[in-house]
Amino acid sequence: MKIAATFLAIHILALGLGMFGLISAVPNVAQFAGNPYALAFYSWAIVNTGTVDIWTGTLAMLAFGVASIGARRTLFFFLAATLISATAELTGTKTGWPFGGYEYTGFLGLKLAGRVPYTVPLSWFYMGFASFLLACKIVQTARVKNELLWSIVLGAWLLMAWDLVLDPAMASDKMTVMHFWVWKEHGPYFGMPLRNLAGSLGTGLVFIAAGRFAWMRPIDARRMAAWLPFGVYAANVIWAMALSLSVGLWPTALAAVALSLLPATFALRPARAGAPLPA
């Protein structure tokens, strides 16, 4: 667990550095012109900070998964999440289905097939895994019937709720210096097509279900150390909220509090004593 906590700390630091760069350094790059060291660091950070925070988030959740539910389950979920999300993204950037017409810029690292940054499936994994483990803890602690179904549905919802606040900001026209992707069509949700949200929810449902069914037996998440997946999830939602506020999208930031952060906090409730889950 110490390894996972270390990667979480680095992940949060990288997110903070990235946010500072986006809202302060990037719009004022001229201030570094007279300082070659600052300019060199800026040049490195603008290319690599996003990659660092995605990799550290991935490593934090991999380490947590191995420590909490075992290497086999963690590997199965990793493969399901990365392969299915990469397939969806490659299909989406070519055909416009299931997310709508869009293309990635060069700010998220090297691209698979020249279209999808290789870091994108990793972000699907670590946020999807965190969302699903939080959902398992919430559903099992509340002793909800049909635990398998509702943990998958809630996990996919928490993942999609992150998109509600992240995507409009990342592609906002007010991000005048750098965009992470560009929409080829206009939609009613702050410029995004609604099918992007449906595609995000559907992709999450598919890979979360695939990863979970590969486990065969359920996990008992009631006494899981939920603070770590919550830390990963909350850090990324708060980062997206800060970016949204920086470009004037306060409605999406408020939506993130109500639809993602508040529901996720229920995973921090202590578990009540009860019978073990069926094998």
What are these regions (language model features)?
Residues 1-279:
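Aromatic-rich, lipid-facing transmembrane alpha helices and their immediate juxtamembrane interface loops
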